[in-house]
UniProtKB/Swiss-Prot annotation:
Region (Amidoligase domain) location: 1-265
InterPro entries named in the record: Class_I_gatase-like, CTP_synthase, CTP_synthase_N, GATASE, GATase1_CTP_Synthase, P-loop_NTPase
Name by which UniProt lists this protein: CTP synthase
Residues given in the record as ATP binding sites: 14-19, 71
Binding site for L-glutamine: 351, 379-382, 402, 469
NCBIfam families per UniProt: PRK05380.1, PyrG
Binding site for UTP: 13, 186-191, 222
CDD domains named among the record's database cross-references: CTPS_N (cd03113), GATase1_CTP_Synthase (cd01746)
């Protein structure tokens, strides 16, 4: 019988509900419980797939092909449960489901309202995602007091009544600001946030108080008094040097024990040695490398959240401090790739649209000609193919039909059909809705023997997650290969190019998929680990010159 932990946030947004939820989930998992996490987002978009990264940050793709909130990336990095389309629901998706039911006549001509129809659908989706787990942690997006969140808060209020206090508890995350000029922490915002929550019928069982410094026992007692929460259940969560320390910080204050008791769970003692090992390894850094991230959303780090974390994981497992230097591709387009002279490796991430493409191509040309380690992801692979076609094969003006439909040499184009991981055929065309034209989720990839890709992965077949519309045009593959491009990875049916590399380069790899989505701090991802290791070697060779 699944137990539920509902997590809300107050005072301000971006406090780290996702990290806190994932950290608690990691501790409960370390106690032998089967844990899943569900994110409820209050925006009206059906999913974040068509939202600007500047608005939303990265879109995290699950193995079953759902385009979801970036918090699901945190969830997968902290727990061993693989997230699915059942782990993220938006207001848009909830309303879409209800409207479809209304159109079918499921409500027998009744008036469809927020209560009970929308709230019932929210509860149904929560239970669907929680099925077969011991504990389901449900994070409510937004901040208490926002009008958009009200249906979700009402739904979880009802669930607490229906399930009882031993099957559902509330955790509220708040901010306790520190005023440097007076040297005081201020508890009033937390008091008001809880008051707002209680006004809609929700009494928190636990408070997690985000602060710059650890809260004193006096502050915790004061917060407990004014919020009607037990003093032991007021948890201080100060800023940490690494997010991977947070499970230990929460465990040290017995948060997991409080949760286990309140939910009457049978669980062994937590073994956090795995997380302690990650933190200890992160502290050992024998070298610093500078990796250039050449993209178009560089003003917002969250746009590349999983890549940032994957590079951090690689650094942990190679004793390397990875310093990511963000370069706006348009700046390289204007001022040239010499901006990259001090860099140890170059990474071109995914993206959509024409803006910045020529700058990415210049960066790739620099990496190829100057033998700088290079990793291209999704659009990064596509621009690597364009660069090679133009500057090595000699196909002047070669391009993707995404950027120039009239190009004489369409080395990349919209592929109308491909085979899914389960062997079924998938199709798309130019008239399909944007949300339906993507090749999404886990796909098989066969790696060619004797290639760098095969050496990096150490096996002949892999599954990686995709999110793209365009593919390498097979018409030009023979010409590309003839001039030295190696096709090191192909799709399950051998029809699509998935990975490329160069024979006359120390470390040049590009992939059509997104390896960052399957990296975690415990193991790292082999592609990122070897990329960072190549950056170390390049750094050492530069020092010798």
């Amino acid at each position: 019988m699944t137990k539920y932990i509902f997590i809300t946030g107050g005072v301000v947004s971006s406090l780290g509900k996702g990290i806190a939820a994932a950290s608690l989930a990691a501790i409960l998992e370390a106690r032998g419980l089967r844990v899943t996490l569900i994110k409820l987002d209050p925006y009206i978009n059906v999913d974040p797939g068509t939202m600007s990264p500047f608005q939303h940050g990265e879109v995290f793709v699950t193995n079953d092909g759902a385009e979801t909130d970036l918090d699901l990336g945190h969830y997968e990095r902290f727990v061993k449960t693989t997230m699915t389309k059942r782990n993220n629901f938006t207001s848009g998706k909830i309303y879409e489901n209800v409207i479809k039911k209304e159109r079918r006549g499921d409500y027998l001509g009744g008036t469809v309202q927020v209560i009970p129809h929308i709230t019932n659908e929210i509860k149904r989706c929560i239970k669907l995602g929680a099925d077969a787990f011991d504990v389901a942690m449900v994070e409510i997006g937004g901040t208490v007091g926002d009008i958009e969140s009200l249906p979700f808060l009402e739904a979880i209020r009802q669930m607490r009544i229906e399930l009882g206090s031993q099957r559902a508890i509330f955790i509220h995350l708040t901010l306790v600001p520190y005023i440097a000029t007076s040297g005081e922490t201020k508890t009033k915002p937390t008091q008001h946030s809880v008051k707002e929550l209680r006004s809609i019928g929700i009494q928190p069982d636990v408070l997690i108080c985000r602060s710059e410094k650890p809260l004193s026992m006096a502050d915790r007692a004061k917060i407990a008094l004014f919020t009607n929460v037990e003093k032991e259940a007021v948890i201080s969560l100060e800023d940490a040097n690494s997010i991977y320390q947070i499970p230990m910080i929460l465990h040290a204050q017995h948060l997991d024990e409080i949760v286990v008791k309140k939910l009457s769970l049978e669980a062994k003692q937590a073994d956090l040695s795995e997380w302690q090992r990650v933190v200890d390894m992160q502290a050992v850094q024998t070298m610093t490398v500078k990796i250039a991230m050449v993209g178009k959303y560089t003003e917002l780090n969250d746009a590349y959240k999983s890549i940032n974390e994957a590079l951090l994981h690689a650094g942990i497992h190679t004793e390397t401090k990875v310093e990511i230097i963000y370069f706006d591709a348009e700046m390289i387009e204007k001022h040239g790739a010499l901006l990259l002279e001090s860099i140890d490796a170059i990474l071109v991430p995914g993206g959509f649209g024409e803006r910045g493409v020529e700058g990415k191509i210049k960066a790739i040309q620099y990496a190829r000609e100057h033998k700088v380690p290079f990793l291209g992801i999704c659009l990064g692979m596509q621009t690597a193919v364009i660069e090679f076609a133009r500057n090595v094969v000699g196909l002047t003006g070669a391009n993707s039909t995404e950027f120039n439909k009239e190009t004489l040499y369409p080395v990349l184009g919209l592929i109308s059909e491909w085979m899914d991981a389960d062997g079924s055929k998938q199709t798309r065309d130019e008239s399909t809705d944007l949300g339906g034209t993507m090749r999404l989720g886990g796909q098989y990839c066969h790696l060619a023997e004797g290639t760098l890709a095969r050496k990096v992965y150490g096996k002949s077949q892999i599954i990686e997650r995709h999110r793209h519309r365009y593919e390498v045009n097979n018409k030009y593959v023979d010409s590309l290969v003839k001039h030295g491009l190696i096709i090191s990875g192909r799709s399950a049916d051998n029809s699509l190019v998935e990975m490329i590399e160069l024979a006359d380069h120390p470390w040049f790899l590009a992939c059509q998929f997104h390896p960052e989505f399957t990296s975690n701090p415990r193991d790292s991802h082999p592609l990122f680990k070897e990329f960072v290791f190549a950056a170390r070697i390049h750094h050492q060779e530069k020092d010798k010159k």
